[in-house]
C-alpha cells in the first residue's frame, strides 16, 4: 500500500470517527418533544418524508428550477460513485475495462454538473448573497474529487494526486456543510415527525406542497 493511499485511509478513519460522534449525538437527542395534540400517523409521515415529499413536484425550490435540480441529482450520483470507487482503489480492486469507461462517462457528466452549479452560485447575485465560503469550498472539493477519480480511472499515474484530493475532502467533510450526508436523514426524520404529529403528512387530497 502506497504512502498516499495510507494517508487517505487515515483521513477516512478520522472522518468516520468524527461522523460517528455526530451520529451518537443525534441518537442521544432522541425524537422531538411536541406538546401539541397528536393527530396523525408518525410512521407513515416519516416514510412519506423520505419518499413522497422528495418528489420534485412537491418542492417549490425544485420544480421551479428543474435544470439545477437535475444537475444536483447527477452531481450526487457522481459523488456516491466516487466514494465507492475510493474503496475499490484503497483495496486495489480492478474493474473491467468496459465498466471502467461507463464510470468515467458518469463522472464526466456529474463533474460538469458540479461545475455548472458552482458557476451558477458564483454568477447569480441572489445565490451569492445566500452563500458563504463553506458553500464554495465544499463544491470545489467534491467536484475536484470527482474529476480526480475520473482521471485516476484513466491513468494510475495520477493516483498520488487522487489520494491527496480524497484525503482533503474526507478531512473537511465533518467540518462543513458536507456533513449533511449524515444530518440529511435526521432532518427528514424530524420533518416527518413534525408534520405527521399534526396529521398533515402523508399528503391527502389538499394539494399541499412542502
Give the residues covered by each predicted segment.
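Membrane interfacial helix-start motif at the N-side
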Residues: 51-75
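Membrane-interface amphipathic/juxtamembrane segments adjacent to transmembrane helices
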Residues: 23-60
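Terminal transmembrane helical module of multi-pass membrane proteins
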Residues: 140-210
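Juxtamembrane "helix exit" motif at the C-terminal ends of alpha-helical transmembrane segments
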Residues: 82-98, 150-155
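N-terminal signal-anchor transmembrane alpha helix
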Residues: 1-32
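Membrane-helix boundary/juxtamembrane motif in polytopic membrane proteins
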Residues: 123-144
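Hydrophobic alpha-helical transmembrane segments of multi-pass integral membrane proteins
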Residues: 12-18, 66-87, 107-117, 138-150
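Alpha-helical transmembrane segments and their immediate juxtamembrane interface regions
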Residues: 88-130, 180-184
